UniProtKB/Swiss-Prot annotation:
This is PKHD-type hydroxylase PD_1553. It comes from the Bacteria. 2-oxoglutarate binds at R173. One of its GO terms (molecular function) is 2-oxoglutarate-dependent dioxygenase activity. Its cofactor is Fe(2+); L-ascorbate. Its EC number is 1.14.11.-. Fe cation binds at H96, D98, H163. The keyword Nuclease does not apply. Residues 78-182 form the Fe2OG dioxygenase domain. Binds 1 Fe(2+) ion per subunit. Keywords: Dioxygenase, Iron, Metal-binding, Oxidoreductase, Vitamin C. One of its GO terms (biological process) is DNA damage response. It comes from Xylella fastidiosa (strain Temecula1 / ATCC 700964). It is an enzyme of class 1 (oxidoreductase).
């Protein structure tokens, strides 16, 4: 399921992040991937240890927590703290697949933890007219889908998808990216639950008979109970 979620960040908030990132110390993005990824990755990335990455990442997590659509679509169990990248002229990232299992930051009790990447997320931090190229291109069984969204908007898609970032030919593309392990492993099941949840919300808003809504809500929670992993 490829889903555009608008206005995770307000325009003012996205602009504020751009301004703070402008003064950041960026590193070569190839330092964060293995030999295969390094052959096709040409961008800059904010270091994992950067206090700014942690500060802005927490702001994004707080914003996501305020989005009912994001929660309904992802049903998050674990989220990798948001990271940040920058594409300047001639930067690009060729087709690649995200790692299936990722390490989470070590907990205070030093217990190691990991995340299964079910959902890949890109949050755009500047507007499309500020750069040329730089489209996120996601390949699935229906072909290739180009994504280039306004500042503050989020795209989510299955982490099983091959994807790339097209070459930037003018300006600069700035974004945050992160991964989610969902309560529901299968993308088709998540899609069905989102469709059902959306229908329930629509019926509730139209003052449909309460018993009808209750029965559908019961179906939703029973499906979630059957499909969820905690």
């Amino acid at each position: 399921m490829l889903l555009h979620i608008p206005t995770i960040l307000s325009r003012t908030h996205a602009t504020s992040m751009q301004e703070r990132l402008a003064a950041a110390n960026w590193t070569d993005g190839r330092e964060t991937v293995g030999p295969q990824g390094a052959q096709v990755k040409h961008n800059l990335q904010l270091p994992e240890t950067s206090p700014l990455r942690q500060e802005l990442g927490q702001e994004i997590l707080d914003a996501l927590a305020r989005s009912p659509l994001y929660f309904a679509a992802t049903l998050p169990l674990r989220t990798l703290p948001p990271r940040f990248n920058r594409y300047q002229e001639n930067h690009q990232y060729g087709f690649h697949v995200d790692g299936a299992v990722m390490s989470l930051p070590v907990a205070p009790d030093h217990t190691p933890a990991s995340l299964r990447s079910d959902i890949s997320c890109t949050l755009f931090l500047n507007d499309p007219d500020e750069y040329e190229g730089g489209e996120l291109i996601i390949a699935d069984t229906y072909g290739e889908h180009e994504v280039k969204l306004p500042a503050g908007d989020l795209i989510i898609y299955p982490s099983t998808s091959l994807h790339r970032v097209a070459p930037v030919t003018r300006g600069m593309r700035i974004a945050s990216f992160f991964w989610v392990q969902s309560l529901v492993r299968q993308a088709t099941h998540r899609h069905q639950l989102l469709e059902l949840d959306t229908a329930i919300q629509s019926l509730t808003a139209s003052n449909t008979d309460h018993n009808t809504i209750l029965r559908l809500t019961n179906v939703y929670h029973n499906l979630l109970r059957e499909w969820s992993e905690t």
